[in-house]
Amino acid sequence: MTSSIPNVTHLKQLEAESIHIFREVAAEFDNPVMLYSVGKDSSVLLHLARKAFAPGKIPFPLLHVDTTWKFHEMIAFRDQMADKHDLDLLVHINQEGVDMDINPFIHGSAKHTDIMKTVGLKQALNKYKFDAAFGGARRDEEKSRAKERVYSFRDENHRWDPKNQRPELWSIYNSQINKGESIRVFPMSNWTELDIWQYIYMENIEIPSLYLAKPRPVVERDGLLIMVDDERMPLEEGETPEMRSVRFRTLGCYPLTGAVESTANTLPEVIQEMLLTKTSERQGRVIDNDSSGSMEKKKMEGYF
């Protein structure tokens, strides 16, 4: 299986670096947690965490912040993985947001993301008093993530200050925090999207089938192909879902995630597309286009 991937050594180096980071954090922090958003990066992150502590169990829980607007397949896949690998899975929903009926159609992507994702995440971190949170973000995804450290320091309000980051020389990480402070940890910072796909293929990692092309009901809005995942999505006048062969490069709340037209329904075909693509995987994420520098603003407020 591995012979068709030219940079296996490179992938093994990335794997070793990520495993080292997992073990460092587990040894240095009192109460770590792994953020599990169910996408391809989370699937690789889970695989790496299991490798880091094999043959034992992962020594920290997984946290999924459920906005109630994820693709149904993502939730089913999440529960399937939790059962299969005997994971300590925590699911948190911002009940205040649910009570206010916050949703992306009425309130827009920015408010929905802030209340159901950012506030929801901070609620969970405060509730369980986690001092370190693993995430699957990579530097190649987006410009604000490109300048974030592996150990990303957060103050007592979970805020990130991009102008006040700690140096990381020779893979030496500064884990010193005061009471109430925390860090976000990104073991896959140095991976690329292509690395992720090649590693998924090499290690035979399970992922949601949303990443593979098949006919799906979509409508075109603001230049994005939005999949009609359930009856809650209001159709505009004259709008009719049509079946198109599409897949997703990134996953989030279904009303805020654009599909790409594709016929790639196997991992080798997806990898071939990655070799030829000229666009960012996050071009289909509505939340990244709320305003200029919106991702950095969200992260400064406590976003993933």
Swiss-Prot record:
The keyword Nucleotidyltransferase applies. This is Sulfate adenylyltransferase subunit 2. Heterodimer composed of CysD, the smaller subunit, and CysN. CDD domains: Sulfate_adenylyltransferase_2 (cd23946). GO terms for molecular function: ATP binding; sulfate adenylyltransferase (ATP) activity. Pathway: Sulfur metabolism; hydrogen sulfide biosynthesis; sulfite from sulfate: step 1/3. PANTHER family: SULFATE ADENYLYLTRANSFERASE SUBUNIT 2. Belongs to the PAPS reductase family. CysD subfamily. Its EC number is 2.7.7.4. It catalyses: sulfate + ATP + H(+) = adenosine 5'-phosphosulfate + diphosphate. Keywords: ATP-binding, Nucleotide-binding, Nucleotidyltransferase, Transferase. NCBIfam families: CysD, PRK05253.1, PRK12563.1. It comes from Pseudoalteromonas atlantica (strain T6c / ATCC BAA-1087). With CysN forms the ATP sulfurylase (ATPS) that catalyzes the adenylation of sulfate producing adenosine 5'-phosphosulfate (APS) and diphosphate, the first enzymatic step in sulfur assimilation pathway. APS synthesis involves the formation of a high-energy phosphoric-sulfuric acid anhydride bond driven by GTP hydrolysis by CysN coupled to ATP hydrolysis by CysD.
